[in-house]
Design a protein with these regions (language model features):
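Short, charged low-complexity linear motifs
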Residues: 1-5, 37, 60-65
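Enriched for short, Lys/Arg-rich terminal
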Residues: 1-7, 19, 26, 31-32, ...
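Short structural boundary motif marking the start of a folded domain
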Residues: 7-13
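A secondary-structure boundary/capping signal
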Residues: 13, 52, 91-94
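N-terminal first-folded block
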Residues: 13-40, 46-48
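Residues that form or immediately flank small-molecule/cofactor binding pockets and catalytic motifs
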Residues: 16, 58-61, 94
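Generic leucine side-chain signal with a strong bias for well-ordered alpha-helical environments
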Residues: 38-41, 56, 87-89
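A short, surface-exposed loop/turn module that caps and links secondary-structure elements
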Residues: 42-69
């Protein structure tokens, strides 16, 4: 997916993520920024602090998910399935797109 380099995790996007990604592309966002983040996550490495990576807690819809900031108002919601070694890309978009 998206030309990722050698990775520890298989990367799978939900249908919602894929739809939102098309919107992000239409908005002119730099997809290379997303690919940079995905390469780190899919390798099982820790993101740099600038991405403000954190677990989403107290949210039934995003149970066991994490969120990072690709840009100040461009987020990625994802989760790992370590049993199957998969990185699931749940959603991407702005704060208002994802939490309203």
């Amino acid at each position: 997916m998206l030309g990722l380099e050698n990775t520890k995790y298989e990367v799978k996007g939900t249908s919602k993520f894929k739809k939102q990604l098309k919107k992000v592309v239409k908005l002119g966002k730099d997809i290379n920024k997303l690919i940079e983040v995905l390469n780190v996550l899919a390798s099982g490495e820790t993101l740099d602090e600038k991405y403000r990576n954190h677990n989403l807690i107290n949210n039934k819809y995003y149970k066991d998910c994490s969120e990072c900031h690709i840009e100040p108002d461009w987020l990625l919601i994802y989760k790992y399935n370590n049993n199957e070694i998969i990185l699931f890309l749940i959603e991407t978009g702005s704060h208002s797109d994802l939490f309203n």
